[in-house]
Amino acid sequence: QLGIKDSVKLDKTYLTLLPQPFSEELVKQYSKIFNGRYFVNENASKDLFINQAKEHKIIHIGTHAESNNLSPELSRLIFAKKVEDKENYDENSLYSYEIYNIDLSSNLAILTACETGKPTYQAGEGMISLAHAFNYAGSESILTSLWEIDEESSAKIVKLFYDNLSKGMPKDEALRQAKLSYIETAEGRTAAPQYWAGLVLIGDTAPIDLKARVAWWWYLAAGIVALILVLLLIGNKKGETN
């Protein structure tokens, strides 16, 4: 006999989740380039994400996920556990039904986790997935996965995707070019569609302005300083003439 059930009531799978070194290195590198913030390992908690994620241009989540085919609202992203919380086994899970009630306003949400875009039909709602939840919560576009993706290959593609976005490419073209570049250098079985075709873009495809904007008052302050310097120089010249 073979018994299959969703691991909602039992969270022992958390102990078997593999580290994601390629995703960690990626987020550290590009958070510096784009002047962002990152949280990894024990700092990547569910509560911190909910408090920090709103109103950013890009939200990037590199973690494990579970798609629940029986109850799609119970599909979840898995964050770091709180060591001190021994009673609430589920405190590190962010479920689809919770995401619908969170402000996740952003130009782009990147969900490099297994099956975040895998949909399940629910009467009256259509196709439900974690990506659908992020879109409802305010993310204008979502880069997501349709199946269990290889962490190393997806990190390479997302890196190329970021590079293309920084060049001003539309998001769909940035992803297409990233996949083509990946295929050109992939060797052996890693060139198979299983390793690169699972990442798809949903939603708005417009480019993202990733250049840091300087507030207007910085220009005003610089102008005032320049004016003061000019006045001081004029005053010095008058003093020398007298």
Language-model regions, residue ranges each:
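Catalytic cores of enzymes
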Residues: Q1-N242
